[in-house]
Amino acid sequence: MASISPTSSSVAALRGHPVQFVKGGAVSKEAKGSISFSPVANSNNANVKFTGLRVAASLKRDGAFPGDGYSGNDNTVLPKSTSVRGQDYPTADSVLPTESIIVPEISNAGLKCVADMFSDEDKDTEQDLDSPTEGFSSISEAIKDIQQGKLVIVVDDESRENEGDLIMAASLVTPEAMAFVVRYGTGIVCVSMKEEDLERLNLPLMVATKENEEKLCTAFTVTVDAKEGTTTGVSAKDRAKTVMTLASPDSKPEDFNRPGHIFPLKYREGGVLKRAGHTEASVDLAMLAGLPPAAVLCEIVDEDGSMARLPKLRVFAERENLKIVSIADLIRYRRKRDRLVERSSVARLPLRWGNVRAYCYRSVIDGIEHIAMVKGEIGDGQGVLVRVHSECLTGDIFGSARCDCGDQLAMAMEMIEKAGRGVLVYLRGHEGRGIGLGHKLRAYNLQDDGRDTVEANEDLGLPVDSREYGIGAQILRDLGVRSMKLMTNNPAKYGGLKGYGLSIVGRVPLVTPITSENRRYLETKRTKMGHVYGLANGQASHQTGSNGAKGEH
């Protein structure tokens, strides 16, 4: 028995609880065993007992446990332990990260979690959902400019047009602003409007939705000019008049000539949360500014007449003193403020792990139903054991060996049951890190041909991880959770749950069995997607690939 000083939060968190230690690298049978910590009365120290473990030189050399009390030598083989269940831990031919891994063993006595699980960079990720993407203005700044009748530049994603539009509130347009739009834009001036206003003005779609062959299915209506106060309809003054007439709640169908020089667009209800386009972004910004739901938008062109891309847009914005914002930031801004789910039903549900209360939540955005399994009483909502699990049909239902999803789900439910209090939120629509079941199976074929899980998605032209956790955060808030011990290996999930009035007070790692089928997958998640598998030397065992991708299947 050796005495150590639990100055590290990792040791303090594990005091009095058995843990499993696995030496990094090629794991040998001799490396498996257990380490028990127990507090010393009237002392800040704890005793540590090694059982069934061949002590490695790196234990002492690397200082895996703080303090100088450890005295074992490099070749010591401590007594075998019968309490270790081999099927719960990596096998002899497994390959793990080079860092040491500490895995808490859960008992009915309670649950402790690792505190220093992610780097400061990971902890800061998306904590403030109002913080703009680097190089962009904040959405709140753009809203203020919209309120003042100013133009802003809105940029969409590279997977769409990757272009910038000049946008302003239609109700505040002036001939001078319109002249600026015509000068630096394509000349095709659009006004995005809600469906009820288009119906009120009898402005039908140019083509039926199912016949729309435009690349992004932009919903153009018939074009118009205002009858009163215009001449040809093409001048900046005439176009401003038409826009003002469209934005007026008092306008009538007979106030317009058809066709004309202004292109009304149909806004999709739900805005950027439903469709991440400029049409939806412009109306969302107008409404967030407290103005009528109509906005002017026009694509910005470069000096040679080509579409201006982001580098040129930044130069243009600085020269003209315009704010530039991204639709991605607007989506995050709205996700923080809009109610995304509604509780639809609740029932007692007996599971193989024990009885829980099952809560069904329906997304108000897409109608997808999600479920939360609640064990015990949430009470004050502090320190609740939580798992936010992404749907994986192949792993969760059919036990696919390609991933560790089913194992993580079962382990999380077992931990919650033993702790006697906790929540598992099961998010549907997250299949294959958001790419869907069909694409996931296509990615599997590419993995069989030699790609890893990241490369396969990229070869299919799909994002490495497109999941959002705002719905999960809102479900937790509705259930009364305020602070949580999060069961995850994924830094992106840590960041994705911050910013919704929730705090994360610790992490519980989920280290599942490694097999010949999922070994490369798990290693790719570590090296390219930033996953953390336990704690070493008081620091997170964490690497982020050069592409910065982060995710958990």
UniProtKB/Swiss-Prot annotation:
It catalyses: D-ribulose 5-phosphate = (2S)-2-hydroxy-3-oxobutyl phosphate + formate + H(+); GTP + 4 H2O = 2,5-diamino-6-hydroxy-4-(5-phosphoribosylamino)-pyrimidine + formate + 2 phosphate + 3 H(+). Pathway: Cofactor biosynthesis; riboflavin biosynthesis; 2-hydroxy-3-oxobutyl phosphate from D-ribulose 5-phosphate: step 1/1; Cofactor biosynthesis; riboflavin biosynthesis; 5-amino-6-(D-ribitylamino)uracil from GTP: step 1/4. Coiled coil: none annotated. Binds 2 divalent metal cations per subunit. Magnesium or manganese. Binds 1 zinc ion per subunit. The active site is at D465 (proton acceptor), R467 (nucleophile). NCBIfam families: PRK00393.1, PRK09311.1, ribA, ribB. This is Probable bifunctional riboflavin biosynthesis protein RIBA 2, chloroplastic. It comes from Oryza sativa subsp. japonica.
